[in-house]
Amino acid sequence: MAKNIQAIRGMNDYLPEETAFWQCVEGTLKNVLASYGYSEIRLPIVEQTPLFQRAIGEVTDVVEKEMYTFADRNGDSLTLRPEGTAGCVRAGIEHGLLYNQEQRLWYVGPMFRYERPQKGRYRQFHQMGAEVFGQQGPDVDAELILLTARWWRALGIQEHVALELNSIGSLEACARYREALVAFLRQHEDRLDEDCRRRMHTNPMRVLDTKNPDIQVLLNDAPVLTDYLDDDSQAHFSGLCELLDLAGIPYTVNPRLVRGLDYYNRTVFEWVTTRLGSQGTVCGGGRYDGLVEQLGGRATPAVGFAMGLERLVLLVQAVNPDFAAAARVDAYLVAAGDGVQREALRLAEQLRDELSSLRLMTNYGGGSFKKQFGRADKHGARIALVLGESEAAAGQVVVKDLATGNQETLAQSDVAARLASILG
């Protein structure tokens, strides 16, 4: 017997019961994006490797250790995208979408990073992101945060996420702070673990991200990034905080928040949760005013965020498991008896014509009424439509509300109106 071929480690199948929940979550996210005037952009999964090296930074963990990179038959180096912003900027430049224009874009799709698989962190994961080009004020930063806050309310998880903010200032301010931080770390190098020593030499601000509790204590005495901000960045950050206060969005200023990619400047933010263990970041982003020019375009202010859908789905399932009840089947058509299947098919199509949003599943596999009602329950149906030989002959159907147990026999022409009444 041939050996079964398994999915690659860290790259998961999502089965129908799971995808129904995912679709409900994604639909909610897309509706909110549309309400803010954002347009979808669809991007390739594979890009030229230099795109990510230039955008993310060659000494970041993503580029150094996590990218899936390979040579194609022409010898060109290609990479499965590890994130979405770089490709979105590349597309904007290539198609002339950015210069002297304002764009609000969103994307969704699989990303790839070679990491140790664990709950909420996989080698193939799905990310949704939004990017705004052509706006440099703190008001658009606030809009993105307000958009995400509206997501959490729509998903019923607003009490389980918290907003953290910081400003890393201009590139010049970052350089000044980096020098001060490296000087501090060198004084205490004997207290650093191997990973932080490496980061001190390659990307010192990433030391601030350490999860090592001993080094976190050490960093309490480290220079504070906000002390090195330029005046414009301070004004920008103050403006953002004022707008969030006005909107009633609570937040915490986290002076160690820097994000993991080199393209950020000024605003950085994360929505975090305590409900997912070590994978606490649900959504993160910030401003990247220099990236468009860095990738060959004209200087264009930009800000955006990205969110891992696996983590979001886990969080919604943990705190609001009934959220996707609406994704279940509305009605299940139970049909039994000689010659009834043809009539069941006709009735199902009639009901779909009359109620375009109706989620109706028809039993085509035979079986007793008891087995068919079991299938209806398995699919979460609210209503069972029972069509036997006598009902088919009389042009009727039994409508049974599975939540209350009430049932009634109706003419088939009246069923759509009754379904609409029950389902609201």
Curated annotation (Swiss-Prot):
Compartment(s) of residence: Cytoplasm
Entry EC no(s): 6.1.1.21
Keywords, comma-separated and alphabetical: Aminoacyl-tRNA synthetase, ATP-binding, Cytoplasm, Ligase, Nucleotide-binding, Protein biosynthesis
A GO MF label: histidine-tRNA ligase activity
Assembly with partners or alone: Homodimer.
Gene name as annotated: hisS
Organism: Sodalis glossinidius (strain morsitans)
GO cellular component, one term: cytoplasm
Catalytic activities: tRNA(His) + L-histidine + ATP = L-histidyl-tRNA(His) + AMP + diphosphate + H(+)
Alphabetical list of HAMAP family matching this protein: His_tRNA_synth
Family: Belongs to the class-II aminoacyl-tRNA synthetase family.
GO biological processes: histidyl-tRNA aminoacylation
Source taxon at top rank: Bacteria
CDD domains named among the record's database cross-references: HisRS-like_core (cd00773), HisRS_anticodon (cd00859)
Keyword Ribosomal protein attached: no
Signal keyword on record: no
Entry-linked InterPro entries: aa-tRNA-synth_II (IPR006195), aa-tRNA-synth_II/BPL/LPL (IPR045864), Anticodon-bd (IPR004154), Anticodon-bd_dom_sf (IPR036621), His-tRNA-ligase (IPR015807), HisRS-like_core (IPR041715), HisRS/HisZ (IPR004516), HisRS_anticodon (IPR033656)
Name of the featured protein: Histidine--tRNA ligase
